[in-house]
Amino acid sequence: METHVSLEGTVQGKAATLRLVGQTLEVILNKKETWLQVPVELVLDVSWKSPHLLISLLAPKRHSEHASRILTRDQWAQRHANKHVASLSLFQFRAHTYDGSSWANTVMTKAYDRTPARRRVLVICNPSSGKGHAKHVLEDLTKPIFQAARFELDVVETTARGDAFRFCTTLDVSRYDIMAFVGGDGTLHEAINGLASRNDAVRALSIPLVPIPAGSGNGLYVSLHGAEIGFSAPVACLTAIKGVPYSHELMAVTQPLDAFGSSGRWPYTLRKTTKDGRGYVQFYSFMSQAIGIMADIDIGTEAWRFIGDIRFTLGYVFAVLRNKACPIHVDAYFGASGTASHASMYECARQTPVRVLQRNGQLQHSSAILHHEQMQPHTHMGTTKDLPSDVHRLRFGTVLDELPMSPTPFDPTSASHPPSDVWTRIHTAVSTVYTGKVPYVARSLLAFPYTC
């Protein structure tokens, strides 16, 4: 049965009716003017202390507090492609009433029907990320929203490369329900590798991780929320507050230890040795891996951070004009012809935002998104029993190990399909290799549309 509860009072000195109609919160002034109408999912907190009712929520931004704020359920249902959602900002108002306790409890129950309210969040901020606006995103957007939702909030700011990694290696993860990251994808990358390097990596990696966009590309954020709504910190905070976790596979990357020189410049890796004593480093990637042009675009445009994500487009143009060859061997493992069609791959990718934690036997981390599942307070996702005891074990060994290779290299210009179920060397000139696990690596680059 659809919920329909009303409360009479005054708002901004006008007679007001506050209504919860199904999944929509409304405020009607003078019995005729719809001053506020938003999906109940946008409600952060409702508290009553006679005679005042304080309501905190996200609503479309307006220049005047007297202007109406309306976001329909249809607009919210299409939020991944609706620019109206990009205008959401924190909005708080008071209603004067003498009997608001029951109404407040009803709205809060509806607003948090999938996740507990008032949980504990750790925010890690990298002030140097992107254009350098992360501090503003933290102080003016992130903190006020979490505080309005009455979350227990701790904040850590990084000051140097590797800080997020080092902090996460010793973090007491049991103190938090969620970790949020104000910065770019690199900040989250450091944190994941810090959590993965711990003795309790399986448990540490079960805490939900949420990106709050303040970097250059913000690929994970865009992949989760869509490119249309831009870099919306309020939407990201809402995800942290009300999102239900889903699993996201991590990719293991290995490189010879001597590739980094004697200084050991790479701070966040697992350093190990092969059976014959050769050293290598192992780390984890959640988004993309690049060699050649695509790597040069990222690393080679570090000095252009101040121009935002357009730095990648300019870097690509210059790299293509140079067309520098990449002297590497590429070995690939192909499935059988017809294993997956474009249609099935697209459907799998389309369902990514509604996957919950179901995969077994893999090292994985979680990124919170909105999903219709129930989550208990102060608990992580309980997957440790399904993961192997050696979470860092590699199925095909390291970059230093020999692979079971097909005797015949594959020429991609030929009409034949490559051999299946065996490693095959690709015989062609290469300028770049680019692989990934999320669709977008930046707003303007849908690099991997069929990832899932």
Regions found by a protein language model. Give the residues of each.
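Surface-exposed, flexible loop/turn segments at secondary-structure boundaries
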Residues: 129-130, 161-163, 187, 217, ...
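ATP/NTP phosphate-donor binding region
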Residues: 1-182, 189, 193-203
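Catalytic core of DAGKc-family lipid kinases
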Residues: 158, 173, 195-438
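Short glycine-/acidic-enriched loop or helix-start segments at secondary-structure transitions
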Residues: 190-192, 221-222, 444-445
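Short, acidic Gly/Pro/Ser/Thr-rich loop/turn segments
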Residues: 62, 130-131, 292-296, 439-443
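Conserved residues at beta->alpha junctions
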Residues: 182-183, 288
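Active-site glycine-centered loops adjacent to acidic/histidine catalytic or metal-binding residues
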Residues: 126, 185, 213-215
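Non-catalytic interaction/regulatory modules that flank or connect domains
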Residues: 58, 424-434, 441-452
